């Protein structure tokens, strides 16, 4: 589903722990990392799409998280020309995203990136709040900066009580 301007509706998910760190996921078979994200299906609300993507990509359910915030507006990024599929109609030139900030409410051992038959990620780790802005692929950097800036005031008070943690090395897929 591509809008009239060539953007695919999408949701992005920032999951934070009580220390204010965020879940950073490694793309399957690659050396690139990002937040979970995915398309909105016809008839789905952004929130419904977020919960579906949360389960497919991270293996968590609604009961495992709490919504702390969502972006006020759609945020857009354009794909580099080399990534645009010019032979498909309508042509998708980028993504327009609604972002959700979630607090992890369950034990992090519940995270399982192998729930889907085609996993998006094969590892994850907790990183400092602003780390993703510097590390994400360049064409997504402005959106990440805007998302993290919008969510910052909400995340900082969450850092009070520490839940149980898995050792800090990035976690491999389960399955």
UniProtKB/Swiss-Prot annotation:
Q: Return the GO cellular component terms, semicolon-separated.
A: cytoplasm
Cofactor requirement: a divalent metal cation
- Taking the record's annotation, the residue ranges forming a coiled coil are none
At the top level of its lineage, which domain of life is listed? Answer: Bacteria
Biological process according to GO: mRNA catabolic process
As annotated in the record, motif Nudix box runs over: 38-59
Q: What is its EC number?
A: 3.6.1.-
Question: What are the alphabetically sorted keywords of the record?
Answer: Hydrolase
Citing just one GO molecular function, the answer is: mRNA 5'-diphosphatase activity
Per UniProt, the enzyme's principal EC class comes to: hydrolase
Q: Which residues form the Nudix hydrolase domain?
A: 6-149
Q: Which Pfam families match?
A: NUDIX
> What does this protein's UniProt record list under function?
Accelerates the degradation of transcripts by removing pyrophosphate from the 5'-end of triphosphorylated RNA, leading to a more labile monophosphorylated state that can stimulate subsequent ribonuclease cleavage.
Record HAMAP family: Nudix_RppH
The family note in this entry says:
Belongs to the Nudix hydrolase family. RppH subfamily.
What's the protein called, per UniProt?
RNA pyrophosphohydrolase
Supply the source organism's classification.
Bacteria, Pseudomonadati, Pseudomonadota, Gammaproteobacteria, Enterobacterales
């Amino acid at each position: 589903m591509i809008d009239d301007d060539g953007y695919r509706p999408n949701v992005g998910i920032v999951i934070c722990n009580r220390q204010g760190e965020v879940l950073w996921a490694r793309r399957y078979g690659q050396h690139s990392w990002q937040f979970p994200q995915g398309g909105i299906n016809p008839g789905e609300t952004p929130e419904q799409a977020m919960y579906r993507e949360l389960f497919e990509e991270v293996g968590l359910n609604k009961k495992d998280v709490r919504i702390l915030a969502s972006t006020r507006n759609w945020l857009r990024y354009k794909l580099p020309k080399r990534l645009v599929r010019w032979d498909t109609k309508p042509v998708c030139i980028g993504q327009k995203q609604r972002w959700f900030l979630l607090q992890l409410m369950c034990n992090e051992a519940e995270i399982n990136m192998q729930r889907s038959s085609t996993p998006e990620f094969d590892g994850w780790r907790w990183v400092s709040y602003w780390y993703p802005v510097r590390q994400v692929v360049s064409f997504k950097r402005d959106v990440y900066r805007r998302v993290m800036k919008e969510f910052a005031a909400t995340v900082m008070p969450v850092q009070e009580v520490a839940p149980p943690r898995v050792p800090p090395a990035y976690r491999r897929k389960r399955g």
